Amino acid sequence: MELRRLEEQEHQKTRKLWEEVFSDDTRAFLDYYYFIKTKENEIWVIEEDGEIQSMLQLNPYQLQVAEHPFLCRYIIAVATRAQYRSRGYMSSLLRKAMQEMYGKKEPFTFLMPAAEAIYTPYDFRFVYSQRQAVFEKKAETELIEEEDATMFQAEELAAFAKERLFGTARVYAVRDAHYYQTRVLEQQSENGGIRMLKKDGKLVGIYCYAKEETCEVLEPLILPGYETVFWDSISGLSEKPVKVLACPEVLEPCARSVERKPMIMVRILHLETLLSVLTVKEGESLSCSFAVIDPILTGNSRIWKLCSQEDGRIQVTETEDSQGVLTIGALTELVF
């Protein structure tokens, strides 16, 4: 048994395992994924009996954490061939990947779990619940200006997203031109696209959509006052109700139903890096110390002292006096 990181030219070797384990994914999507995403990601594998039997992929995303940009990794395609399961392969891959990311001082990693219980023992915790809404087809719609974006419109999409997302959350994915160039191709691989909505020539909304067995809309960004334009647009996608993922609260009045579903789990990696970018609200102060227990990334297992500065930033140091003890998982729930 050999655990190693593949060279980029070897990434295609994992496609066979992906097709076996994730058989619902279409050929069109995998063609896109293995042509685009595997050019920039990392793939860790375990080889045995001359073949790749287990894998874990790390896709890079530029995230904005408070005022600081970070390159963080999204864990995806954690898979083991059926006859090689229950041998601890996933655990070995996960621990190795986490240690490597810790060595790069990456603040945290994240994933969408197949089951919460798989990742809780590794101190992953849910930190984000996605608002999911169902929209009925609108009985009467108005004529609207709309088109599907091309890769050449990625700059326009990015500028619109930056304006809409700035200040809305302390942690979010940076949707720059590169993000949208890639996203256009991803949505096209799922028989969809990125729809641009306009009013009198002005861009008032964008959303991603996929039309496979069902129709789904993702990441809608709509200017205030143009909610019905969005409803008009998605009513033209399908005769059946449309599910909208990551639905903004402002669109809820138009929806038939809305629910929140736990979606993203986070695992803190390099704790000092993460703590150093935290801030306190204006007019507030912070002074505390606590011990952290991290059985996997033991470099985090120290006694940390946090003191806020006049500009709101937090000074992070080590101390010998602890006011309490936290597991790294419990700290994740507090920080996020």
Could you tell me what each predicted segment is?
Residues 1-60, 67-74, 139-178, 212-215:
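Short amphipathic alpha-helix that is part of the acyltransferase structural core
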Residues 123-142, 220-228, 232-336:
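Active-site/acyl-donor-binding loops of N-acyltransferases
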Residues 129-233, 248-250, 279-282:
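Amide-forming acyltransferase catalytic core, primarily the GNAT-like/NAT-type
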